[in-house]
């Protein structure tokens, strides 16, 4: 056949590259096409690099002045670590996924995957004790500890593994399959990043190229053993929920699974800031995302489940690095200088580095600005993709460590490291009990921890309080103490923590939440909206208040939560709230609001096209006006659009409607003019 050069490519390889500069030059040259060649260079660099021992790897790394790197744990203590987390005692739990073979192979053949508990008993910054909690569950990819046991993501299941007597050995006969259906097609895009949210739900991520249908298992479900094949089919109790890229959550008491947001690529790493705003880091596509419940986000490939999304929410990052970020963690502790407070830490696989970004509030959301190249491994076989912040305020990064950095093959099965990044002079206060078992503290102390400078302690304390409330063992006066904190504390972040703690312990009535909708703090109002809608059935009193707030609330953050709430109520209940939201012309250029409002309005259009077109005529958000008209045409309701066009006032309004009308007609043939078209 004919061979033709369609674009020039110049490959320059000298063993060491300035990854960020090369990426920017390459994108300018190619118009952002062909950047995959950089992945090839990075993979080649890894395969050709000299293997470094953990000690040599530490010496080879560079870090910001005033900080140090040390190996907290490494082979042979751990191998093939795929996930890690903390427990109430400040011990680190590590999932060794020794069943991983390649992106397309591996499930249970190795048979020796383990869940380890690592401890630094003398607090010298190095793990010195290793306990095997569980062995033989195939393909462990995500872990979280809380509420009496281990929550383990191991496709196809989300398992609860209890340890009722606290002997650090799994009660294997009592393991529960809470969810099933997680896919495994692309083994480095599986269920990952389990993380307790402020609202008592367990959050996680799922990759784009591993389609899954997730739901409650039929009867008790099936727990897989070494040597067994991944199932061709799983059976559900009821229907499953589709997810093929996104953020999800599961409530351990209500036993309910939800997709929080659809899209992305291979999101790995999720965390929330002091206001409870969630962020993820992602691979391949831009790296940083503000996650809003109900959001539909840019996808690396494929189509959205809903064909009427029309446009999706884009990254908040205003810059690019080499692709493949993971492990997002917002620094909310006291060991680092104030400069790092609220910054988001991420590992970067292709840059072999830990990077920080600044989360700058903007409208209803954020702009992610590059802060620092905090730590560079200078080691082409360093594969960091998960991070944690510990009880002492230090930052930890998990290094899968392999000569194949993209997971196509496992070339070094017996390696794995966890590095600690710490200030040479920690600013953390070493108060009495800082490293004690949080689960052994009384409720008074757990409430006090909600004002801690260490978010680690506030969060662990909240999970413990939640567990006590579930068992009916919450001490008398605990809710009263939290209410006092909420009402009297001058720190807005501490008030939010008190609100969350009240919620997870059952201390918030609807009447109290309705009252909080008038709070002076926008984030208190916003979170009260979300909590009132948690069960998808806000009361008539809440709906009336929401409609008023949609018109009158001055905060774009509150309006964002109202837009998100639209998807958690019936179609009939959405109209008044939507009418208030579309009246804010100041939101027309907002990064999130017009699209999120549209996602809530979209199913209303085919349900009542005439009323929807009235909403379009009243809307002061051009995107919403355009999309309502387009959706009406897609629903075959040309007459409704034609009639609205005839009544529309102003050239801009007519132009917005016509754009939607034209887009809806695109590709159609033999379209008959609607009856009113001549008059219009």
Whereabouts are the PLM-identified features?
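Short intrinsically disordered, low-complexity coil segments enriched in acidic
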Residues: 1-6, 44, 96, 210, ...
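Short Pro-Gly-centered flexible turn/kink motifs
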Residues: 1-12, 328
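Non-catalytic surface loops within mature trypsin-like serine protease
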Residues: 12-14, 332, 425, 603
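Terminal connector regions
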Residues: 14-41
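Surface-exposed helix-capping loop/turn segments at secondary-structure junctions
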Residues: 15-23, 255, 335-337, 471-476
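Beta-propeller domains with acidic blade repeats across secreted/periplasmic ectodomains
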Residues: 40-448, 456, 464-466, 509
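Long, ordered, helix-rich scaffold segments
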Residues: 398, 414, 421-680
């Amino acid at each position: 056949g004919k061979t033709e050069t369609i674009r020039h490519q110049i490959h320059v390889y000298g063993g060491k590259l300035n990854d960020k500069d090369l990426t920017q030059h390459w994108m300018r040259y190619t118009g952002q096409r062909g950047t995959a060649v950089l992945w090839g260079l990075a993979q080649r660099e890894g395969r050709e690099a000299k293997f470094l021992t953990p000690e040599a790897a530490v010496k080879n790394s560079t870090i910001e002045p005033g900080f140090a790197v040390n190996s907290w744990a490494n082979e042979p203590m751990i191998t093939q670590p795929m996930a890690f987390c903390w427990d109430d005692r400040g011990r680190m739990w590590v999932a060794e996924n020794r069943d991983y073979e390649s992106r397309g192979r591996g499930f249970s053949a190795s048979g020796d995957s383990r869940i380890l508990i690592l401890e630094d008993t003398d607090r010298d910054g190095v793990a010195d004790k290793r306990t095997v909690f569980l062995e033989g569950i195939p393909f462990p990819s995500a872990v979280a500890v809380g509420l009496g046991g281990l929550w383990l993501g191991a496709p196809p299941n989300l398992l609860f593994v209890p340890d009722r007597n606290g002997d650090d050995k799994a009660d294997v006969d009592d393991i529960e399959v809470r969810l099933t259906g997680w896919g495994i097609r692309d083994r480095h895009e599986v269920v990952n990043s389990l993380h307790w949210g402020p609202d008592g739900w367990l959050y996680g991520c799922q990759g784009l190229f591993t389609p899954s249908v997730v739901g409650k298992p039929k009867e008790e479900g099936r727990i897989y053993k070494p040597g067994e094949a991944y199932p061709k089919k799983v059976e559900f109790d009821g229907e499953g929920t589709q997810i093929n890229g996104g953020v999800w959550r599961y409530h351990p008491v209500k036993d309910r699974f939800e997709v929080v947001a659809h899209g992305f690529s291979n999101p790995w790493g999720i965390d929330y800031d002091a206001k409870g705003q969630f962020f993820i880091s992602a691979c391949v596509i831009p790296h940083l995302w503000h996650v809003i419940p109900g959001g539909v986000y840019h996808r690396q490939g494929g189509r959205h489940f809903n064909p009427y999304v029309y446009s999706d929410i884009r990254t908040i990052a205003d810059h690019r690095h080499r692709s493949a970020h993971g492990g997002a963690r917002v620094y909310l502790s006291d060991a680092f200088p104030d400069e790092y407070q609220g910054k988001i830490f991420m590992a970067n696989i292709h840059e072999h580095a830990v990077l920080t970004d600044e989360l700058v509030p903007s409208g209803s959301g954020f702009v992610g600005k590059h802060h620092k190249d905090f730590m560079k491994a200078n080691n082409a076989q360093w594969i960091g993709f998960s991070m944690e912040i510990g009880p002492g305020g230090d930052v930890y990064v998990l290094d899968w460590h392999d000569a194949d950095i993209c997971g196509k093959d496992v070339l070094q099965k017996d390696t794995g490291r966890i590095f600690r990044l710490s200030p040479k002079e920690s600013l953390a206060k070493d108060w009495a009990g800082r490293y004690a078992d949080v689960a052994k503290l009384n409720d008074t102390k757990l409430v006090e921890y909600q004002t801690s400078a260490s978010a680690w302690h506030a969060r662990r304390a909240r999970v413990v309080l939640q567990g006590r409330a579930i068992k009916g063992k919450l001490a008398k006066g605990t809710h009263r103490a939290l209410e006092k904190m909420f009402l009297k504390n001058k720190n807005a972040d501490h008030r939010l923590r008190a609100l969350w703690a009240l919620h997870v312990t059952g201390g918030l009535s609807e009447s109290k939440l309705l009252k909080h909708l008038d709070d002076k703090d926008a984030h208190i109002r916003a979170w009260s909206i979300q909590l009132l809608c948690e069960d998808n059935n806000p009361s008539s009193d809440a709906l009336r208040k929401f409609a008023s707030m949609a018109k009158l609330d001055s905060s774009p953050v509150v309006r964002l939560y109202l837009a998100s709430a639209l998807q958690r109520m019936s179609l009939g209940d959405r109209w008044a709230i939507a009418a208030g939201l579309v009246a804010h012309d100041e939101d027309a250029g907002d990064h999130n609001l017009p699209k999120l409002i549209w996602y809530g309005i979209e199913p209303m259009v085919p349900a009542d096209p005439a009323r929807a077109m009235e909403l379009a005529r009243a809307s002061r958000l051009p995107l919403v006006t355009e999309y309502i008209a387009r959706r009406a045409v897609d629903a075959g309701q040309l007459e409704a659009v034609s009639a609205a066009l005839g009544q529309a006032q102003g050239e801009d309004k007519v132009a917005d409607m016509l754009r939607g009308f034209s887009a809806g007609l695109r590709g159609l043939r033999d379209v008959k003019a609607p009856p009113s078209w001549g008059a219009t």
